[in-house]
Amino acid sequence: MAKSIVLYGGQFNPIHIAHMVVASEVNAFIKPDVFYFIPSFISPLKEHTDYLEGRYRVDMIQSVIDDLGFGRICLNEIERRGQSYTYDTVMYILDKHPDAKLYLVIGTDQYNQLHKWFKINELKSYITFVIVNRDKTTQEVESEMLSITIPRIDISSTLIRKRVKNKENIQALVSPSVEQYIREEGLYES
């Protein structure tokens, strides 16, 4: 039987409670054999202010994996460097697991930008998109895509970076291990 693999990519700068909720809900819904967190090197459709080295983001993701009790990190995009195109990452995963059933987790913001994605039509033939809706903002999706709804959690990595810089509390926004890591490493302070 083919393996089922979930791919959950992002900058994770830093990884926070909303990311953890998405991962938990998708993992419970799909019940994959493997759940990969994939930190991007440079996301083609995002701004790159407050960029943080991959090693710090990887350490924080690993602490969240330890907290969640599931998941692995795929370092392909960080090791490849340059623009992080999902198509290239999917080809890498399929090279390692040619018979796998792949699920790619994206939010409604990314769903609405799919027309801008690199090799999107080819990509659709290799994966099943899992569109994560937040609370009442349910996105109608194409028939070959899956859709799940999670509670709305208004947390962003930008907000966390800003609060750290302003020496404000982030305790309810990230896991205790991520907060401790941010403080110990002095991340986002300047």
UniProtKB/Swiss-Prot annotation:
It comes from the Bacteria. GO terms for molecular function: ATP binding; nicotinate-nucleotide adenylyltransferase activity. Gene3D superfamilies: HUPs (3.40.50.620). HAMAP family: NaMN_adenylyltr. This is Probable nicotinate-nucleotide adenylyltransferase. It catalyses: nicotinate beta-D-ribonucleotide + ATP + H(+) = deamido-NAD(+) + diphosphate. One of its GO terms (biological process) is NAD biosynthetic process. It comes from Staphylococcus saprophyticus subsp. saprophyticus (strain ATCC 15305 / DSM 20229 / NCIMB 8711 / NCTC 7292 / S-41). The lineage of its organism: Bacteria, Bacillati, Bacillota, Bacilli, Bacillales. Pathway: Cofactor biosynthesis; NAD(+) biosynthesis; deamido-NAD(+) from nicotinate D-ribonucleotide: step 1/1. InterPro entries: Cyt_trans-like, NadD/NMNAT, Rossmann-like_a/b/a_fold. SUPFAM superfamilies: Nucleotidylyl transferase.
